[in-house]
Regions:
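Ser/Thr-centric signal marking residues that sit
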Residues: 62, 161, 174
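Histidine-centered active-site/metal-ligand motif
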Residues: 63-68, 138-140, 169
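Structured loop/turn residues at beta-strand edges in well-structured enzyme cores
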Residues: 54, 67, 110, 127-129
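A short, active-site helix/loop in glycosyltransferases that binds the activated sugar's phosphate group
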Residues: 92-102
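Active-site metal-binding motif and surrounding structural segment of the metallo-beta-lactamase
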Residues: 30-34, 38-88
Length: 174
C-alpha cells in the first residue's frame, strides 16, 4: 500500500478518519443536504438521514477528484436504487459525469438528477438557508473546483474542500 506518513499511521494504528464532507440540516423542514459524496457516503448518509431523522434533499459537489464525488455510486441500482436525487454541479462537473461511466448510468437510470449551478449565485434551499458556490484555485484536470458559503438566519460557514495556495497571488500592500 501507500507509504506516505498519513497512510503509515493508519496501517500502524488502525484508526480510519472519514473523508471530509459537510452535512447541512434544516430541522424545521426535516431535510438535509451534503456537500460532496465521498467514498464514506454510506456512513455520512446514515448520519444525516437516520441519526438526524431527515430526508436527503440534495448533494452539492465541489469537484471531480476521487474523494469528492465517487460516493454517488451508492445511489445506483446496485446499492440503494434511489430515484432523482438532486445533485448540484458546475458546468464542467456536469459534463464529466455525463461523459464517463458509471456516472452516466446514474443519470440515464434517473438515480440522480443533475442541476447546474453558477459561481457566485445564491441558491435558496430552506426558509432562511442559502448556499453559494465560488471558484477555488485547485488542480482542475476534469472539472472546476468550488467552495461553498452556507448562510442561515444567524450564522454562516465557508467550506473549501481543496485549495492550491501556490496558485493564489497575494499582493503586497502599497
Amino acid at each position: 500500500g501507500c507509504e506516505s506518513a498519513c497512510c503509515k499511521n493508519l496501517w500502524q494504528h488502525g484508526k480510519k478518519e472519514k473523508i471530509s464532507s459537510i452535512g447541512i440540516i434544516d430541522p424545521k423542514q426535516r431535510k438535509s443536504w451534503m456537500i460532496d459524496a465521498t467514498p464514506d457516503f454510506p456512513q455520512q448518509y446514515r448520519k444525516l438521514t437516520v441519526e438526524h431523522d431527515t430526508e436527503l434533499a440534495g448533494i452539492f459537489l465541489t469537484h471531480a477528484h476521487i474523494g469528492h464525488y465517487t460516493g454517488l455510486i451508492h445511489l445506483g441500482r446496485e446499492v440503494m436504487g434511489e430515484k432523482n436525487v438532486p445533485v448540484f454541479v458546475m458546468e464542467n462537473m456536469e459534463e464529466f459525469l455525463k461523459s464517463n461511466g458509471p456516472w452516466d448510468q446514474l443519470i440515464r437510470l434517473k438515480n440522480i438528477q443533475l442541476n447546474r449551478i453558477k459561481k457566485n449565485v445564491n441558491i435558496k434551499i430552506g426558509d432562511s438557508l442559502f448556499i453559494e458556490p465560488f471558484l477555488v484555485p485547485h488542480r482542475d484536470e476534469y472539472s472546476e473546483t468550488v467552495g461553498y458559503q452556507v448562510t442561515g438566519q444567524n450564522n454562516s460557514l465557508l467550506y473549501i474542500p481543496d485549495i492550491d495556495l501556490s496558485l493564489i497571488h497575494i499582493s503586497e500592500p502599497t
